[in-house]
Regions:
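A short acidic, Gly/Pro-enriched loop at the edge of an enzyme's catalytic core
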Residues: 95-104
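A C-terminal cap/extension of S-adenosyl-L-methionine-dependent methyltransferases
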Residues: 201-255
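Class I SAM-dependent methyltransferase SAM/SAH-binding core
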Residues: 50-93
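Short alpha-helix
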Residues: 178-196, 202
Length: 255
């Protein structure tokens, strides 16, 4: 997995971070996440990519440690800011930081979708050990039922792909690389995490705002994209739409 994301590192900001869709989806995450940061001081980010979120946290005066399995992603992040960026595997994260405690563990835009169900079970079974009392997880995860993708494949007459996210795993295309990806609806995460975490909130990210792979289509339709963004603002607190969005933000608190 690390080598695959190494190849994506050089172009990741251009193909997602700095796109109009990427900025809109990230703004949604920040607006909701900010509601849960009042008692937070120390943050651990996993799957930090090129460091965009770690830089945002640092600008809010949080102590942030940001990790990614891809050494190339970490190289790009370190060129952008002098923060505590480290190469680390999600599956070993509780071991790597066994002597530390964090108030918040954050994973943005589908980082945890790289984990199989058994790996995700292990993550939830162990990660509470590095969280402070009442510490939280803030996780942005890709769903099984996103309507945008269904409409996209229907329009392209690719009928066999309409429900592809419901398969056990899918090879997702990321900057020329095929990444094994697992999709989880909110209920899946609630059930997997329930032993050690209680659910605080679940909010849709990208119900009207399209997935990032459609940014090119909307490049010359900025007015329509702004309209979709306004529509998004009207449903951003509607939990029931979360499993139909591109992503959702789930906040879990350590029991």
């Amino acid at each position: 997995m690390d080598a695959s994301f190494d190849k994506a590192a050089a172009n990741y900001d251009d193909t997602f971070t700095h796109t109009a869709v990427g900025k809109m989806q990230r703004a949604l995450v920040y607006a909701e996440l900010s509601k849960h940061l009042t008692s937070v001081k120390n943050i651990l980010e996993i799957n930090c990519g090129t460091g965009e979120d770690a830089i945002w946290f640092a600008k809010q005066n949080f102590n942030v440690t940001a990790t990614d399995i891809s050494a190339k992603m970490i190289e790009v992040a370190r060129r952008k800011a002098s923060l505590n960026f480290q190469t680390a595997d999600i599956n070993l994260i509780a071991k790597v930081f066994e002597n530390e405690k964090f108030d918040l563990l954050f994973s943005n835009f589908g980082g945890l979708n790289c984990l199989s169900k058994s790996e995700l079970e292990n993550f939830f079974a162990t990660v509470d050990s590095i969280l402070a009392e009442k510490g939280k997880l803030a996780l942005v995860i890709m769903t099984k039922n996103t309507l945008w993708e269904r409409f996209y494949f229907l329009a392209k007459a690719q009928f066999k792909n309409i429900s592809r996210r419901k398969k056990e795993s899918v090879l997702a295309h990321v900057d020329g690389e095929n990444i094994t990806t697992y999709y989880y609806n909110p209920k899946d995460i609630v059930n997997l995490a329930n032993a050690n975490f209680e659910t605080v909130s679940i909010k849709p990210i990208g119900f009207f705002i399209p997935p990032s792979y459609l940014d090119g289509f909307f490049k010359n339709k900025k007015g329509f994209l702004r309209f979709l963004n306004r529509m998004e603002q009207g449903v951003k607190n509607t939990t029931s739409l979360s499993k139909y969005a591109d992503h959702y933000l789930i906040i879990l608190q350590k029991r």
